[in-house]
Amino acid sequence: MPINKFSARSLDNDVPNKPLIFVMEGRYQNWIKPIMLLECLEIDYDAACIDGPTTRTDWFTRLHPQRYVPAMIDVEDGQRVSSWDSSQMLQYLSNKYDAKRMWNGHNAAENLEICNWLTFETASLGPTAKYWVWYALRQGEEQNPKAQQKMYNDLRVQYSILDKHLAQPGQNWVGLKDRPTIADLAIYPFADDPTMARMGIDKKDFPSLKAWSEALSKVPGVAKAYAELDSRKEIAIGA
């Protein structure tokens, strides 16, 4: 029986028949990653757009101890499985659903390089962008211009690292030279036009990064995930 995404009891206990991704209106940079991959692979999935109070419920806390989105429920050998890290979701989903390994490596060396850049996003670019936004939203005495400037400078360093990497001969994509992978999907939401514009960073300063971003934005699954951003509306979840 399919999971009922409008029932907290079902979401807490039942086994889905396809991946279910929890998302939230507004900041999309993490939760859009698994959705881009699922769209690129043309895998059927469901999404539940939840509000802030829902993330603090007992059932969601059991699913995601840090109470963030994305979180994911899926089925594996008839058993309910879950994940609550966007990079881990990319690895899990590509390993399970990408039989042709279009978005993953074809050997150990390729997988290692892809994981290098997944880690770059998880440990560097993503957290830096997150805390830049946190400081940018502070008001009055909570403002810390020095800390915010530090985050901004660090972001420019990280974009510079990406730009230099992509400027190497034949390096059309982040993880591998010849094709986009889950590493590109992990990094793109923190280097798309709206995000960099919000941070006051001109993409013209990073021409290779700009060219890569424009190319990835035209990948059909990526374009579809972004086109549907505004359609993700909060749902009411009952008992």
UniProtKB/Swiss-Prot annotation:
Keywords: Transferase
Residue ranges of every copy of the GST N-terminal domain listed in the record: 18-101
UniProt pathway: Mycotoxin biosynthesis
Record keyword ATP-binding present: no
GO function terms (MF aspect): glutathione transferase activity
Ranges where the GST C-terminal domain occurs: 107-237
Top-level taxonomic group: Eukaryota
Catalysed reaction, written as an equation: RX + glutathione = an S-substituted glutathione + a halide anion + H(+)
EC number from the UniProt entry: 2.5.1.18
Key word Transferase present: yes
Induction statement: Expression is regulated by the cluster-specific regulator verZ.
Alphabetical list of PROSITE patterns matching this protein: GST_CTER, GST_NTER
Observed effect of gene inactivation: Completely abolishes the 11'-deoxyverticillin A production.
Leader sequence residues: none
Function of the protein: Glutathione S-transferase; part of the gene cluster that mediates the biosynthesis of 11'-deoxyverticillin A, one of the dimeric epipolythiodioxopiperazines (ETPs) from the verticillin family that act as mycotoxins. 11'-deoxyverticillin A is required for normal conidiation. The nonribosomal peptide synthetase verP is speculated to be responsible for condensation of amino acids to form the carbon skeleton of verticillin, whereas the cluster-specific tailoring enzymes are involved in further modifications leading to the production of 11'-deoxyverticillin A.
Family: Belongs to the GST superfamily.
Name recorded for this polypeptide: Glutathione S-transferase verG
Organism in which the protein naturally occurs: Clonostachys rogersoniana
Gene behind this protein: verG
